[in-house]
């Protein structure tokens, strides 16, 4: 009998805050008023969504894929840390670096704002990992024009190696 798929959310676990770390590629920013609202939400309702992480077995740490700001609330507010006994609800996914970057962007696209420089660096990193523009478009929900603009920001000619020459570039 074929085993059915089980979403990671059904395996949420309590992880010590000290074992959770930020990733280096999240371009999502939350303004101070929204952070205060997130604090109030967690204070009043508790954690209603787990922080999505990738487990780095070699370092015994959980790297955040989604939920960085929920993590920051526990890290920066002693009352929340104490109430939760320093334990953060975590849902673990096992994906490659490129897939984790894409997942972070997908989780963030509908909320917050994105730092354009960080987004262009992410597109550059994915390109350097061998991801095609079509892959980036599909997995990050970006148009070809948006990818092109973000590549232009980095100014790295290597990112255009798969592009055909256009007279408009002259």
Describe each model-derived feature in a short phrase.
Residues 72-76, 104, 122:
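Generic beta-strand or strand-like secondary-structure segments
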Residues 15, 30-33, 93-96, 114, ...:
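Short coil/turn linker and secondary-structure boundary residues
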Residues 85, 110-170:
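Alpha-helical interaction elements
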Residues 1-91, 138, 148-149, 159-161:
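Short, charged/polar connector segments at secondary-structure boundaries
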Residues 100-112:
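Short, Lys/Arg-enriched N-terminal segment that forms or immediately precedes the first helix
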Residues 70-71, 96-98:
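Short, charged/polar surface micro-motifs in flexible loops or helix N-caps
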Residues 34-37, 100, 122, 146:
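Exposed alpha-helical structural elements
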């Amino acid at each position: 009998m074929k085993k059915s798929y089980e979403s990671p959310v059904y395996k949420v676990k309590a992880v010590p805050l000290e074992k959770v770390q930020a990733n280096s590629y999240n371009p999502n920013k939350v303004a101070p008023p929204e952070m205060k609202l997130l604090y109030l939400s967690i204070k009043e309702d508790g954690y209603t969504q787990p922080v999505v992480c990738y487990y780095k077995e070699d370092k015994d740490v959980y790297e955040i894929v989604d939920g960085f700001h929920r993590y920051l609330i526990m890290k920066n507010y002693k009352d929340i840390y104490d109430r939760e006994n320093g334990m953060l609800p975590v849902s673990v996914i096992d994906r490659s670096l490129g897939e984790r970057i894409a997942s972070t962007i997908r989780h963030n696209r509908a909320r917050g704002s994105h730092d354009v420089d960080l987004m262009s660096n992410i597109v550059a990193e994915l390109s350097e990992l061998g991801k095609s523009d079509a892959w980036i478009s599909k997995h990050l929900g970006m148009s070809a024009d948006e990818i092109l603009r973000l590549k232009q920001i980095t100014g790295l000619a290597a990112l255009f190696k798969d592009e055909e020459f256009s007279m408009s570039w002259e």
